[in-house]
Amino acid sequence: VLRVAVVGSGPSGVYTAQALLQQSRVPDVRVHVLDRLPTPYGLVRYGVAPDHEKIKSLQSSLRAVLEDERITFVGHVEVGGPGGLSPARLKELYHAVVYCVGAAADRPLSVPGEDLPGSFSATEFVSWYSAHPDAAADGFALHAGSAVVVGVGNVAVDVARILARGAAELRATDVPRAALDALGSSRVRDVHIAGRRGPSQARFTTKELRELGALPGVRMVVDGTELALDPAYAAPAGGPGTPPLPAVVRRNLEVLRGWSQNPPPAPHGLERRIRMRFFLRPVELLERGGRVAGVRFARTAPDGAGGVRDTGAYEDVEAQLVLRAVGYRGTPLPGLPFDPAHGTVPHLAGRVLRDGVASPGEYVAGWIKRGPTGVIGSNRSCAKETVASLVEDAPLLVRGDVTADPLEALRASGQLPVEWDGWLSIERAEAELGRSLGRGRVKIPDWSGLLDAARGEGR
């Protein structure tokens, strides 16, 4: 029997486990899917916006994999760090270990004032409204009148949409009670989404963009002069010597052009505005009374080579809440090699490289392998590549002498694993919490609540 540990139960971890079951070269495989949290699914549970039910429904296909009898979910197990299992110890327990630990850190803006109260990463905000147990309980300045979201990807659009969406609509989702109450009493009326380049370089998808325009009681505001600055905006179909833009960019430009030329009529009792801004590079977060009060942007313009240059002009945008959404990056896992320049673990076709040499029995998949790129489905092919390497190495790996019962060894080392039955208990507790509040399922947002629920103890 080939015993494999997969560290991380998000999409990359589950797809890795699935690929191990689907391959035929090593018929007898047993997989333990370990996670630091007592809950599975990673960013599908804690990163997908609560109003995106279709994407969240992906949990059912991940669940089907984790319920296979050859797979054991082992939550609430720390790997690396103080009190955690070291990679060296995991190699003693399993023939192979695949690290699928994602890229949890956010990229900073690296500008003065970034650490002022009222300035947060989008990751912190998403974790809060997604009920991640590590999230700060509160502190988001939702009494603010104006918010700035720095970044023009789907995460930026997500957080802007949640800020602008009414509590009545979010009530139908699994947003935790405290976040729902806070968002319901939010005074944010203006949300600025700002990017340093033009609309043709924006990373959001057209579907996400259109959702903003469909929000009830929200008006989209786009400055046509900022669109006109972008050379690609003028001729999206291309021309002599100029290739046509990708279809998604052309569709985005059409949506933005529509909002700028034919702004939708102001709905009755207009409450909120989302302003799409381009060619603005943040240079400083402004302070007043010890808190963030705005963002100073340098105005940029196309440099003719796909980038931007500063124009020498500046613009201050008032904001009492600033959320940065300029990308994720991986963080080092103690005991594993790490490439700080790329925020990834060095590898060759998924095999972990130590000092340039493949380390037997150690593998990576997902964002910690390739960086935070692609969509959820991109993890499937990434996992298959890694599993192909592992299976190729399996004849040597399976000769290794490993512990007969890794779970017992985990408990003996002081870990208190939450297995699949414990997760099902958490699901039941969240359904009951929702019923008690007259809602659908509502997430439990704290460690003690999750662990009590996993043990079947009442809240």
Locations of regions flagged by a protein language model:
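Glycine-rich dinucleotide-binding loop and its adjacent helix/turn
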Residues: D106-S185, G343-D355
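Dinucleotide-binding/catalytic capping subdomain of oxidoreductase cores
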Residues: R30, R161-R309, L390, A394, ...
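C-terminal, flexible cofactor-proximal segment of oxidoreductases
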Residues: P117, R351-R459
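Glycine-/small-residue-rich beta->alpha transition segments that form the dinucleotide
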Residues: A96, C100-R107, G153-N154, A319-P332
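N-terminal Rossmann-like FAD-binding beta1-loop-alpha1 element of flavoenzymes
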Residues: V4-V26, V157-L163
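N-terminal Rossmann-like dinucleotide/flavin-binding domain of flavoprotein oxidoreductases
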Residues: R30, P38-A96, L253-L270
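Beta1/beta-strand and adjacent pyrophosphate-binding region of the FAD-binding site
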Residues: V1-G10, H143-V150
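FAD-site-proximal beta/loop scaffold in flavoenzymes
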Residues: G118-A136, L285, R291, D303-R370
